[in-house]
Amino acid sequence: MSETRTAPYDLGADTHTVRIESTNHDGSFLGKNLTPRKFAATASSGIAMADLLFGLDLGNAPTFGFAFPEWRGHVSDVEFRPDMSTLVQWKPGLHSVIGDYWQTGGEPVGTCPRNLARSLVDRLATRGFTACIAVEIEATLFEESIHEARAKGYRGLTPLGGSAGTAYHLAKSSDWVDYMSAVVRRLDGGHPGQ
């Protein structure tokens, strides 16, 4: 798991956008939307992004005091390196790829979750172990968009699936079932349209 795959790729002539994305230390998906031409020109060398993305809280406000990024009067760049093995067509015309953040000197950003996971997997391998993971989804989702929820002060929101209770309670409406089915397909290696 030491390296990400950067094999050749074909986006197809109908692609108008490539969304690059990765998580920060809070698990928030952050990234950019690029034209296919810009993506092709920068994917192998790294795509510059401000290290500010590691200093944003869940409300998207800059927060100071973290060990990384080390802001001392300026915001530095980090490089996004796409993992081409994660490239999928998200919907017609839009491709999405997950990647990792690296410092411009070539060192992995230690607070990047994928880099951290990679270093842990590599450390386990040196001791003769193989890492395995599992995901348990425990969440309450709401029908309102993030903008609507903020405007309401995160109060009086409508739970997706109705008010049937906990995540284990299966008496939920079809919108919950449809959503969770899509999540399970995606986690199982599928993507929209499969």
Predicted ranges, named:
Residues 1-194:
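ATP/Mg2+-dependent ligation/transfer catalytic cores
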